[in-house]
Amino acid sequence: MIMCHKCNTLSCLILTSLFFNLYVLVCLLFTYIMNKGQQLWDNKSFHYITPSLINFISFTKNTINCFTTYPNCSFYSIRKRKSRRRLTRGVSVLPKMAGDETAIVSSGNMVFEPILEEGVFRFDCSTDAKNAAFPSVSFVDPKVRETPLMNIHQVPAFVPVFQSVAGQQVVTIELPPGTSLYGTGEASGPLERTGKRIFTWNTDAWGYGSGTTSLYQSHPWVLAVLPNGESLGVLADTTRRCEIDLQQEASIKFVSQPSYPIITFGAFASPADVLRSLSHATGTVFMPPKWSLGYHQCRWSYPYDARVREVARTFREKNIPCDVVWMDIDYMEGFRCFTFDQERFPDPQDLVKHLHQSGLKAIWMLDPGIKHEKGYFVYDSGSQKNIWIQTADGKPYIGEVWPGPCVFPDFTQAEARSWWADLVKDFISNGVDGIWNDMNEPAVFKTVTKTMPESNIHRGDADLGGPQPHSYYHNVYGLLMARSTYEGMKLAHENKRPFVLTRAGYLGSQRYAATWTGDNLSTWEHLHMSIPMVLQLGLSGQPLSGPDIGGFAGNATPKLFGRWMGIGAMFPFCRGHSETDTIDHEPWSFGEECEEVCRLALQRRYRLLPHIYTLFYVAHTQGAPVATPIFFSDPKDPDLRKVENAFLLGPLLIYASIERNQQLDKMQHQLPCGIWLSFDFKDSHPDLPALYLKGGSIIALAPPHQHVGQASDTDDLLLLVALDEDGKAEGILFEDDGDGYEYTRNGYRLTTYGAERQSSVVSVRVLKTEGSLKRPRRRLHVQLLLGGFAKIEAWGIDGETLQILIPSEKEVSNLVLLGQQEFRTRIESSRPIPDENDGAGHKGVELSRTPVDMRSGDWALKVVPWIGGRIIAMEHLPSEKPYSMIYSLKHVLLVYYMLFGYKVREAFIALDDEELLLSILYKLLKEYGSSSSY
């Protein structure tokens, strides 16, 4: 029995002798949380979802506000294995259920109907459930999801089973043993997701780890590769918090509030076919301007105009390719969006003009938080239009972010999106080339949940779901903000393609914005994770992504930075970024040896830009992925399904070293079946990835310009050719103006090149051309790969047949031997990157903010000074036992599993992973660590 000190209500909990001590600890811990919420968090809200106990609860001041029609109450009682759960004022929290709190109300196979195209099915629990489902936000056209196809007579290969448990809709799909699971969007951890669990709840996840369960974006989507290589995509089309449980082998489980449909894509012949089908529903990636595929240099922050100019000048002086320089939040006046600090950035138009003269673009940040300040034109105009998100009592919600107290636009309203788009249009007149939407989960300071109350109200458009609580719109807030920004940029320049980068997103965000993997750490672990994270986003419909190269938080070492740049230069989105109070993280900041590796890496990228740009054209027009796991080359091969240090850019395979002490030339490369020919640009280095081209392929290359604007139609065109077993190869090249929309009006050139060996001659010719753009008179340079870094070169004119004479077998063997010798010579003569700053046992990061040692009673904590504090280590002094964030989380959740059952454990992970519980624990230890009751 535990007595609530506030309302004298008894909380009856059944104790088990086996876990008695843990039980008492947790009961006391959460009694204090409920009773001391006001003192602990300065009247700030603490929200969590517990599906098997109550729907939505918010601890604020001395009451518990239960959303969804439940009135305020001062406490609530929990009675294990009772048929009703009541608040002290007698209001039922859950519907009456028989027996245990996890009793199943209903279950069965879901009913289906074909939609969209052949092989795509919608599943609902019942006709009533279908009618109760909210509109789709992920679909380009929500009506498509609601319209069954009448001429399709297929039946699905796999039928989901549903259960209604404790007010939750649980959907399970069982697949054949040996199935590999991928997708889940922006997720840390391994590439193959079996054994993992993800919660779709957009979260400001600074310094996330490999086990973090909620990051900045939500993709309730799983890609399953069956044992025979066929693939199936499964979408839980809900915007609410959703658990994706992949802990059981070959089993997919979704848990969320009802009602939501399940959409399956396939099974199709390959994972690429599934992603193409998904793009028909959720849309393809926007066509990026070509300059956005170059290298981007960012920093939180370049503090003033002169420093930006200095960085730009240094890139050109050091002959390091770069296309974009970014301005983080400090360019603003007092962090007010759409303003410029008059002292530090007095003339943004002149700055942009200067950058443009150097061939550089400028991208500027815009956050959703608008300072609550009369006289500030953005606040005044938004208030006049009444477009702010509201609290449950109808007042504008005010939360603290960078400017201080802020209001937040309600992007679920067309009027608010139009208002924001007009602001963006005016902002672009300063010469802004691109916009960066940050903090749009939305992140809010000084709250344990790091976001706004779920009880806040959005007055959404009917086609989005109408007026709903924030819990419904939270996961799509970033998508809708990115959409508004994108539309504002189109208003400003109808003949320029917008470029928007968004931190938060949802399935379908690729229609409006690129993304990155958030606030990572300068560690070898995060370098490793960056590859599967980029690939998972691509496998979830977002092909334009990349990490903060070098790591955002912490000081990279020279070797870590150089290795990361080598890999990052091959990602679809290529940007270096670091946080304030770290050392400089520009390519020249780590010594001459690292600078040279960065130069070589970025020159590689710029050579490959014609190929990368072509991949994005195919992604935009056909929904094909850009960067893919290497099992895409042979989905039937189970040995390829967990490879995390290699990936494909079309037929180009990038093999990277992700271990600190493992140089690339010492590694054994696991290649897919078939012909894979190694090559380089006479730039091989132990810290750069190895490159292979698949037999049967042709890719186009360009000179390594300093920026995209230097390229010309009359530049030499280089074709890299790798013949297959039949002596043939084929590839495409897409060309247009690199910006604008003429390509939609036939103003482009799509060339299919072919190569074929006949006897001792290989002929290279144009097989097909699409588009009205005329072929320029330019030289054609063909390199025919022989393997072992050997090649035969020939010159001709683009558009004319070029014939290459193949030497004898002995001469080819000698060329291969010579190529291998030259490769070894380049490796041995390269200057290794020193790493004297990376001490033994250290993961490669020096925290940019010195941890503060704090002690409370029997506990010692290390906290990184930050907004609200970040706990990085805990130790129980009497036992000298350290507790990492994950380990201590497991202890707490284990107790919850024993006390309240499986669903409660899931609910607490869904909230905020380990940081939530540890933040609570820290606050309690600080208040009660020395108390006898604790």
Regions found by a protein language model. Give the residues of each.
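Accessory, solvent-exposed terminal regions and/or long lumenal/extracellular loops of proteins
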Residues: 696-801, 823-825
